[in-house]
Amino acid sequence: MLTVALPKGELLKNSIRLLQSVGLDFSAFLDSGNRQLQITDASGTAKGLLVRGQDVPVYVEYGQAQIGIIGYDVLREKQPQVAHLVDLQFGYCRMSVAVKASSPYKSPLDLPAHSRVASKYVNSAREFFQGLDLPVEIVPLYGSVELGPITGMSEAIVDIVSTGRTLKENGLVEITTLYESTARLIAHPLSYRLNTGNLHQLVEQLREGALTKV
């Protein structure tokens, strides 16, 4: 039986709609009263796992799920050993550097050397500033990263931005974009190579389904 890892949160609804378009129904995960973390499609051919977004590539890499749907931001940060198959064209957001709107910094290179940068995307932040040859201290934060500059703990943040509303409401402004992110279909490399459970056909159906929704 095929197992699909699905992310809790923003990507879940569109992920389920896409899977429904190819005949796999995990819509029970969207029910407000649902407490199940694992359900089987009515056809009996596939099982869905509902997990934290950060954990989707882990389940796929270790083979507990043959495929999964997750944002490119997570893949870029975690660098898991999975097969990257399809850009699903939904869940758009961007990884950005932001500072206080009242600050003098108009670009990352305006930041003083050894500034503090708060982020839950530690690897992405470090890679970016190393690429600029600008030494900074990355401060790991895993909630309300915007408070870093507000409280003075950091001069900047690196975080995911979708509409920019949260930044604006907290007096922050973007000064550059590291990369853009959308939902991606990933697979366990060996399962995909061996075409376990006719995986290639399903992937092509999902690819076509994603294209028709663009």
Swiss-Prot record:
Pathway in which this enzyme or protein is active: Amino-acid biosynthesis; L-histidine biosynthesis; L-histidine from 5-phospho-alpha-D-ribose 1-diphosphate: step 1/9
One term under GO cellular component: cytoplasm
Protein name: ATP phosphoribosyltransferase
Keyword annotations of the record: Amino-acid biosynthesis, ATP-binding, Cytoplasm, Glycosyltransferase, Histidine biosynthesis, Nucleotide-binding, Transferase
Key word Cell cycle present: no
Catalytic function, reaction form: 1-(5-phospho-beta-D-ribosyl)-ATP + diphosphate = 5-phospho-alpha-D-ribose 1-diphosphate + ATP
Molecular-function GO terms, alphabetical: ATP binding; ATP phosphoribosyltransferase activity
Organism expressing this protein natively: Nostoc sp. (strain PCC 7120 / SAG 25.82 / UTEX 2576)
Entries under PANTHER family matching the protein: ATP PHOSPHORIBOSYLTRANSFERASE, ATP PHOSPHORIBOSYLTRANSFERASE ATP-PRTASE
Domain comment (free text): Lacks the C-terminal regulatory region which is replaced by HisZ.
NCBIfam families membership: hisG
Quaternary structure and interacting proteins, as annotated: Heteromultimer composed of HisG and HisZ subunits.
InterPro entries from the UniProt entry: ATP_PRibTrfase_cat, ATP_PRibTrfase_CS, ATP_PRibTrfase_HisG, ATP_PRibTrfase_HisG_short
Single Gene Ontology BP annotation: L-histidine biosynthetic process
Broad class of where this protein is predominantly found: cytoplasm
Its EC number(s): 2.4.2.17
Record localization: Cytoplasm
